[in-house]
From Swiss-Prot:
The keyword Ribonucleoprotein applies. Part of the 30S ribosomal subunit. Belongs to the universal ribosomal protein uS10 family. Involved in the binding of tRNA to the ribosomes. One of its GO terms (cellular component) is ribosome. InterPro entries: Ribosomal_uS10, Ribosomal_uS10_CS, Ribosomal_uS10_dom, Ribosomal_uS10_dom_sf. It comes from Streptococcus suis (strain 98HAH33). This is Small ribosomal subunit protein uS10. GO terms for biological process: translation. The keyword Ribonucleoprotein applies. The gene is rpsJ. Keywords: Ribonucleoprotein, Ribosomal protein.
Length: 102
């Protein structure tokens, strides 16, 4: 797998679990002899939801909720077969979405 690159995008609602998952991936990749670029923090996606508090009337009384999606990007440069095998067996915390591109 010479001159190849693995790009890993991580998404999570909690930034602490996202950072621990990114640290595990970086530590595993460096331990198996690959070069790592990242984790690079990507812009946080924010979603707002406005809901009427009362059931039938009092439309002026509303409540707003926000949902944030934190993202990180990790590039693994020149991965070996040992690196790929170690990443496949890696156990990441729940709540972290992982997208891998070769």
């Amino acid at each position: 797998m010479a001159n190849k690159k693995i790009r890993i995008r991580l998404k999570a609602y909690e930034h602490r679990t996202l950072d621990t998952a990114a640290a595990k991936i970086v530590e595993t990749a460096t331990r198996t002899g690959a070069q790592v670029a990242g984790p690079v923090p990507l812009p946080t996606e924010r979603s707002f939801y406005t809901i009427i508090r009362a059931t039938h009337k009092y439309k002026d009384s509303r409540e707003q909720f926000e949902m944030r999606t934190h993202k990180r990007l990790i590039d693994i440069i020149n991965p070996t077969q040992k690196t790929v095998d170690a990443l496949m067996k890696l156990d990441l915390p729940s709540g972290v979405n992982v997208e891998i591109k070769l």
